[in-house]
């Protein structure tokens, strides 16, 4: 994998992924930024949340579950020191579908956390306390 990050101005950077997609990142005003893009640590949370959600949806589809939506809420706690690394990250999957089997949703969440989500597993190995749970909403 490769990525290129180019400084634009102030605390704003543009990142271009190896697959050619771009994203603007910026810092808060109190750090010289103008809040024109996501912050790098927010990008990590977006990455881990998307990686896990991708797994959960794919596993549920392969389990023949009629999943119609998956919203992943990610909450993190950072240490109160420099560097302000993540101490804890919690992922809550709000899964919607028709007659979803809770055991299969639990299995999908567990497999993502323990076997498939590279981002989540990497952060866990680095010492971040990773937790996951889910709720199910019946689709109309």
Task: Pin down the residues of each PLM region.
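Extended beta-strand/beta-hairpin segments
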Residues: 1-46, 57-140
């Amino acid at each position: 994998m490769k990525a290129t990050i180019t400084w634009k101005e102030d605390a704003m950077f543009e990142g271009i992924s190896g697959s050619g997609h771009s994203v603007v990142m910026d810092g808060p005003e109190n750090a010289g930024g103008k809040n024109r893009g996501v912050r790098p640590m927010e990008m990590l949370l977006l990455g881990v949340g998307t990686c896990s959600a991708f797994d959960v949806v794919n596993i549920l589809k392969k389990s023949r579950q009629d999943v119609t939506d998956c919203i992943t809420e990610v909450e993190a706690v950072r240490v109160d020191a420099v560097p302000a690394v993540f101490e804890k990250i919690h992922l809550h999957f709000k899964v919607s579908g028709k007659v979803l089997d809770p055991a299969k949703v639990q299995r999908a969440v567990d497999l993502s956390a323990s076997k498939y989500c590279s981002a989540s597993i990497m952060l866990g190995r680095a010492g971040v306390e990773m937790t996951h749970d889910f709720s199910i909403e019946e689709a109309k």
